[in-house]
Protein backbone atom coordinates (compact mmCIF):
# COMPACT_ATOMS: atom_id res chain seq x y z
CA UNK A 1 0.00 0.00 0.00
CA UNK A 2 1.27 3.44 -0.88
CA UNK A 3 1.02 6.39 1.42
CA UNK A 4 0.24 9.97 0.59
CA UNK A 5 3.08 12.30 1.50
CA UNK A 6 2.56 15.47 3.46
CA UNK A 7 2.86 18.76 1.63
CA UNK A 8 6.38 19.65 0.59
CA UNK A 9 8.12 22.69 2.09
CA UNK A 10 7.60 25.87 0.08
CA UNK A 11 4.16 24.92 -1.19
CA UNK A 12 1.45 27.55 -1.28
CA UNK A 13 -1.66 27.50 0.87
CA UNK A 14 -3.68 26.86 -2.32
CA UNK A 15 -1.53 23.82 -3.11
CA UNK A 16 -1.94 22.52 0.43
CA UNK A 17 -5.72 23.00 0.22
CA UNK A 18 -5.78 21.20 -3.13
CA UNK A 19 -3.79 18.30 -1.68
CA UNK A 20 -6.29 18.02 1.17
CA UNK A 21 -9.19 18.05 -1.28
CA UNK A 22 -7.55 15.41 -3.45
CA UNK A 23 -6.97 13.12 -0.48
CA UNK A 24 -10.73 13.09 0.08
CA UNK A 25 -11.83 12.88 -3.55
CA UNK A 26 -9.69 10.19 -5.18
CA UNK A 27 -10.99 6.65 -5.18
CA UNK A 28 -8.74 3.59 -5.59
CA UNK A 29 -10.11 0.97 -7.99
CA UNK A 30 -8.31 -2.34 -7.48
CA UNK A 31 -7.27 -4.45 -10.47
CA UNK A 32 -8.36 -1.98 -13.13
CA UNK A 33 -7.75 -1.81 -16.05
CA UNK A 34 -5.84 -5.04 -15.42
CA UNK A 35 -4.95 -7.28 -12.47
CA UNK A 36 -2.36 -5.79 -10.13
CA UNK A 37 -3.08 -2.17 -11.06
CA UNK A 38 -4.65 0.26 -8.60
CA UNK A 39 -6.42 2.90 -10.69
CA UNK A 40 -6.68 6.41 -9.23
CA UNK A 41 -10.24 7.47 -10.07
CA UNK A 42 -10.85 11.23 -10.11
CA UNK A 43 -14.59 11.08 -10.83
CA UNK A 44 -15.47 11.83 -7.17
CA UNK A 45 -13.50 15.08 -7.59
CA UNK A 46 -15.27 15.90 -10.85
CA UNK A 47 -18.69 15.34 -9.27
CA UNK A 48 -18.00 17.79 -6.42
CA UNK A 49 -17.95 21.34 -7.87
CA UNK A 50 -16.47 23.05 -4.80
CA UNK A 51 -13.63 20.52 -4.57
CA UNK A 52 -12.97 20.69 -8.30
CA UNK A 53 -12.84 24.49 -8.06
CA UNK A 54 -10.17 24.34 -5.35
CA UNK A 55 -8.02 22.04 -7.49
CA UNK A 56 -8.47 24.15 -10.64
CA UNK A 57 -7.55 27.24 -8.61
CA UNK A 58 -4.30 25.62 -7.49
CA UNK A 59 -3.47 24.71 -11.10
CA UNK A 60 -4.20 28.30 -12.16
CA UNK A 61 -1.70 29.45 -9.51
CA UNK A 62 0.93 27.09 -10.94
CA UNK A 63 0.34 28.50 -14.43
CA UNK A 64 0.52 32.12 -13.22
CA UNK A 65 3.70 31.50 -11.21
CA UNK A 66 5.38 30.19 -14.35
CA UNK A 67 4.07 32.89 -16.70
CA UNK A 68 2.23 30.39 -18.89
CA UNK A 69 0.54 31.87 -21.96
CA UNK A 70 -0.81 28.55 -23.20
CA UNK A 71 -2.19 25.50 -21.41
CA UNK A 72 -1.74 22.09 -23.05
CA UNK A 73 -3.95 19.24 -21.85
CA UNK A 74 -2.97 15.62 -22.38
CA UNK A 75 -5.77 13.29 -23.54
CA UNK A 76 -8.07 12.43 -21.98
CA UNK A 77 -8.34 13.48 -18.34
CA UNK A 78 -5.82 16.27 -18.84
CA UNK A 79 -8.48 17.99 -20.97
CA UNK A 80 -10.83 18.11 -17.98
CA UNK A 81 -8.23 20.06 -16.01
CA UNK A 82 -6.55 22.13 -18.71
CA UNK A 83 -9.74 23.65 -20.14
CA UNK A 84 -10.93 25.41 -16.96
CA UNK A 85 -7.36 26.54 -16.18
CA UNK A 86 -7.02 28.10 -19.65
CA UNK A 87 -10.46 29.67 -19.30
CA UNK A 88 -9.68 31.28 -15.93
CA UNK A 89 -6.39 32.64 -17.29
CA UNK A 90 -7.73 33.79 -20.65
CA UNK A 91 -5.02 31.58 -22.15
CA UNK A 92 -4.97 29.43 -25.26
CA UNK A 93 -5.78 25.73 -24.86
CA UNK A 94 -3.90 23.10 -26.84
CA UNK A 95 -5.33 19.57 -26.83
CA UNK A 96 -2.68 16.86 -27.10
CA UNK A 97 -4.53 13.96 -28.70
CA UNK A 98 -4.01 10.35 -29.59
CA UNK A 99 -3.05 9.76 -33.20
CA UNK A 100 -5.81 10.20 -35.76
CA UNK A 101 -8.15 12.28 -33.57
CA UNK A 102 -7.32 15.76 -34.92
CA UNK A 103 -8.47 16.98 -38.34
CA UNK A 104 -6.06 18.80 -40.62
CA UNK A 105 -2.26 18.98 -40.55
CA UNK A 106 -0.65 17.75 -37.34
CA UNK A 107 2.73 17.29 -35.69
CA UNK A 108 3.31 14.03 -33.88
CA UNK A 109 5.58 12.28 -31.40
CA UNK A 110 5.85 8.53 -30.90
CA UNK A 111 6.90 6.98 -27.61
CA UNK A 112 7.43 3.51 -26.18
CA UNK A 113 4.91 1.62 -24.12
CA UNK A 114 5.52 -1.57 -22.18
CA UNK A 115 4.37 -3.58 -25.21
CA UNK A 116 4.60 -1.42 -28.33
CA UNK A 117 4.39 2.27 -29.13
CA UNK A 118 1.87 5.10 -29.06
CA UNK A 119 1.67 8.39 -30.89
CA UNK A 120 0.30 11.76 -29.79
CA UNK A 121 -0.45 14.78 -31.96
CA UNK A 122 -1.13 18.51 -31.91
CA UNK A 123 -2.41 20.68 -34.73
CA UNK A 124 0.55 21.90 -36.78
CA UNK A 125 -0.37 25.53 -36.02
CA UNK A 126 -1.36 25.02 -32.37
CA UNK A 127 1.72 26.54 -30.76
CA UNK A 128 4.05 29.37 -31.76
CA UNK A 129 7.74 29.44 -30.85
CA UNK A 130 7.30 32.37 -28.44
CA UNK A 131 4.65 30.70 -26.28
CA UNK A 132 5.19 29.60 -22.68
CA UNK A 133 3.28 26.35 -22.31
CA UNK A 134 2.21 24.58 -19.13
CA UNK A 135 1.44 20.89 -19.63
CA UNK A 136 -1.49 19.62 -17.54
CA UNK A 137 -2.53 16.04 -16.81
CA UNK A 138 -4.17 14.08 -14.04
CA UNK A 139 -1.39 11.65 -13.12
CA UNK A 140 2.35 11.36 -13.66
CA UNK A 141 3.12 7.64 -13.61
CA UNK A 142 5.75 6.26 -16.01
CA UNK A 143 6.14 9.59 -17.79
CA UNK A 144 6.02 8.31 -21.37
CA UNK A 145 3.15 10.44 -22.58
CA UNK A 146 4.34 13.55 -20.73
CA UNK A 147 7.88 13.19 -22.10
CA UNK A 148 6.52 12.82 -25.64
CA UNK A 149 4.25 15.86 -25.15
CA UNK A 150 7.18 17.90 -23.85
CA UNK A 151 9.29 16.90 -26.84
CA UNK A 152 6.47 17.68 -29.26
CA UNK A 153 5.95 21.19 -27.88
CA UNK A 154 9.65 21.95 -27.49
CA UNK A 155 10.18 20.69 -31.04
CA UNK A 156 8.08 23.57 -32.41
CA UNK A 157 10.05 26.06 -30.33
CA UNK A 158 7.65 26.57 -27.44
CA UNK A 159 9.06 27.01 -23.95
CA UNK A 160 7.52 24.31 -21.78
CA UNK A 161 7.43 25.92 -18.33
CA UNK A 162 6.37 22.82 -16.41
CA UNK A 163 4.12 19.82 -15.99
CA UNK A 164 1.29 20.29 -13.49
CA UNK A 165 -0.48 17.12 -12.37
CA UNK A 166 -3.05 16.26 -9.75
CA UNK A 167 -1.01 13.28 -8.58
CA UNK A 168 2.52 12.03 -8.98
CA UNK A 169 3.00 8.32 -8.35
CA UNK A 170 6.47 8.61 -6.82
CA UNK A 171 7.07 4.85 -6.85
CA UNK A 172 7.13 4.96 -10.67
CA UNK A 173 9.88 6.57 -12.81
CA UNK A 174 7.82 9.40 -14.30
CA UNK A 175 9.81 12.30 -12.87
CA UNK A 176 13.09 10.85 -14.13
CA UNK A 177 11.63 10.22 -17.58
CA UNK A 178 10.46 13.83 -18.02
CA UNK A 179 13.62 15.42 -16.56
CA UNK A 180 14.65 18.22 -16.71
CA UNK A 181 11.01 19.36 -16.97
CA UNK A 182 9.75 21.00 -13.77
CA UNK A 183 7.08 18.68 -12.31
CA UNK A 184 4.45 20.26 -10.04
CA UNK A 185 2.20 17.65 -8.42
CA UNK A 186 -0.64 18.83 -6.21
CA UNK A 187 -0.35 15.50 -4.41
CA UNK A 188 2.46 12.95 -4.23
CA UNK A 189 1.57 9.33 -3.65
Curated annotation (Swiss-Prot):
GO biological processes: adenine salvage; AMP salvage; purine ribonucleoside salvage
Keywords for the protein's UniProt record, in alphabetical order: Cytoplasm, Glycosyltransferase, Purine salvage, Transferase
Enzyme class of the recorded protein, top EC level: transferase
Gene3D superfamilies reported for this sequence: 3.40.50.2020
Localization per record: Cytoplasm
Keyword Cytoplasm tagged: yes
Gene Ontology MF: a single term: adenine binding
Top-level division of the source organism's lineage: Bacteria
Primary location recorded for the protein, binned into one broad class: cytoplasm
Pathway: Purine metabolism; AMP biosynthesis via salvage pathway; AMP from adenine: step 1/1
Paired cysteines (S-S): none
EC number: 2.4.2.7
Catalytic activity: AMP + diphosphate = 5-phospho-alpha-D-ribose 1-diphosphate + adenine
GO CC annotation, single: cytoplasm
InterPro entries (UniProt xref): Ade_phspho_trans (IPR005764), PRibTrfase_dom (IPR000836), PRTase-like (IPR029057), UPRTase/APRTase (IPR050054)
Function text: Catalyzes a salvage reaction resulting in the formation of AMP, that is energically less costly than de novo synthesis.
Complex and partners: Homodimer.
Family: Belongs to the purine/pyrimidine phosphoribosyltransferase family.
PANTHER family: ADENINE PHOSPHORIBOSYLTRANSFERASE (PTHR32315:SF3)
Name of the protein described by the UniProt record: Adenine phosphoribosyltransferase
Organism, scientific name: Frankia alni (strain DSM 45986 / CECT 9034 / ACN14a)
Taxonomic placement: Bacteria, Bacillati, Actinomycetota, Actinomycetes, Frankiales
